[in-house]
Each structure stands twice: as C-alpha cells, then as structure tokens.
Amino acid sequence: MTPHEPASIFKRIAALFYDCLLLIAVFFVITAVAVRVNGGEAIESPLYLMALIPVAWIFFAWFWINGGQTLGMRAWKIKLVNESGDAISVRSSVTRFAVGLVFFPFVLLPALFDNDKRGLHDKLAGTKILRLKQY
C-alpha cells in the first residue's frame, strides 16, 4: 500500500463520527459558559445555534490546515491534502466545510463512483483524503 491511495468511505465516516463526538464536547463547554453568562437560563434563540457553526469550522479548519488530520483522522490513519499532496489553504477549508455542511449527508455520494473516492466537497475544494501507510 502506498501513502497515496484514497481513503475508504468507511474510514472517512468513522473519522467524522470521532470528530463529531469531540465537537459535541466543545459545544457542551461553550454552552455551559453561555448559560452561565445568561443568568442560568437556557438560550432558546436559533441565532445561538448558528453561532456554533463558525466554532465547528474553526475546529475542523485548524486541524486540516495544521497537519491535515483531525483527531478522528489520526485514529483512522487518513490525511487531508490538496491536489498536489500539500497542506490545504484556508480558502479550501472554507469551501470544504461549507459544501459539506450544506449538502450533508449527500456529500459523499460522488465518492461511491469516483476512482479517487472524492466527495463533492473534496472536488469543489480541490482536496483529497489519503490512506496513510501503517507501520
């Protein structure tokens, strides 16, 4: 196996599941602080939920830009790179996240029919997820 083989859809979904568990923990901490600031009252505004979207992007983008691997991706030994095999840009991270968010859960459907197993968000962002060599 070379380090340039595309990662399987199963590994991508498993890594996303791990990352979502971590992101939920981050949301819990932010919400606990926000409720405290709000005098102990629940925050019922949909604007609060919308404010969590940039938090999610920062969570994913930081890992994607700095090393190409979220914690879930590290666990499943997969890595996000641009089409040249280098680290992705901030612009690519915005595109990838936004398309993934808007078209979830259908974003991976193109990967079922693509030789490089690239989802819609990867195609539009110019990124790909590789399976890393295991030692």
Where are these regions (language model features)?
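Membrane-interfacial and juxtamembrane segments of integral membrane proteins
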Residues: M1-Y135
